[in-house]
Regions:
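Conserved acetyl-CoA-binding loop-helix of GNAT-fold acetyltransferases
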Residues: 101-114
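Conserved acyl-donor/pantetheine-binding loop and adjacent beta-alpha core of acyl/acetyltransferases
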Residues: 52, 58-92
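Conserved active-site alpha-helix within GNAT-family acetyltransferase domains
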Residues: 121-123, 130-149
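Active-site/acyl-donor-binding loops of N-acyltransferases
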Residues: 145, 150-162
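Residue-level recognition of the GNAT/N-acetyltransferase active site
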Residues: 91, 96, 100, 131
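Short amphipathic alpha-helix that is part of the acyltransferase structural core
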Residues: 1-34, 38, 43, 52-54
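A structural microfeature
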Residues: 56-57, 148
Length: 172
């Protein structure tokens, strides 16, 4: 399967996609287009290049911040003493229920990191909001770390994201 990643086009039908998670399915059907249109999130879709109108997965990115006090001291020591650190948040990620277990979720995460690292927007931390413990385990495979205070929230320093993107580019 040759995946095509692109921004959710305005007016694109969102019928036919389900990931099996009621909250994510509802977001996809009712909110994704509005969030992108109103500037609350960038919605990136994945489809097979042969059938570009059939969505097989999506994710959202948004500007965010994290309190410096939430970052472990070893990392925070190397950052400016601003109260909040600029971040990018991977808020939602979903794969069609019929295609789960085929590493499409991993490709969505890698595309989100690549897209974020190639952006001229300044950010230091990449945030992920996992929906359940099983998802936390998935993100930890990419070397995301848990926040001590919020066990379903994870983070990665930009330099780590850039290393992953660089390794990914070499393997292609």
């Amino acid at each position: 399967m040759n995946l095509l990643f692109r921004l959710l086009p305005a007016g694109m039908s969102r019928d036919g996609f389900t990931c099996g998670n009621k909250a994510l399915d509802a977001y996809w059907r009712t909110q994704a287009g509005q969030d992108q249109k109103r500037g609350f999130a960038t919605v990136v879709i994945a489809s097979d290049a042969q059938t570009p109108d059939k969505i097989i997965g999506f994710y959202t990115l948004a500007a965010a911040s994290v309190l410096l006090t939430d970052i472990p001291e070893a990392e925070a020591r190397r950052m400016p003493r601003y109260p909040a650190v600029p971040a990018i948040r991977l808020g939602r990620l979903a794969v069609a229920s019929t295609l789960q277990g085929q590493h499409i979720g991993s490709l969505l995460v890698l595309d989100a990191l690549r897209r974020s690292c190639s952006n001229e927007l300044a950010w230091a931390i990449f945030l992920v909001d996992a929906k359940e413990e099983r998802s936390v385990t998935f993100y930890e495979k990419f070397l995301f770390k848990r926040f001590a205070q919020r066990p379903l929230s994870l983070w990665m320093h930009r330099k780590q994201a850039e290393r992953i993107v660089k390794l990914m580019a070499k393997s292609i």
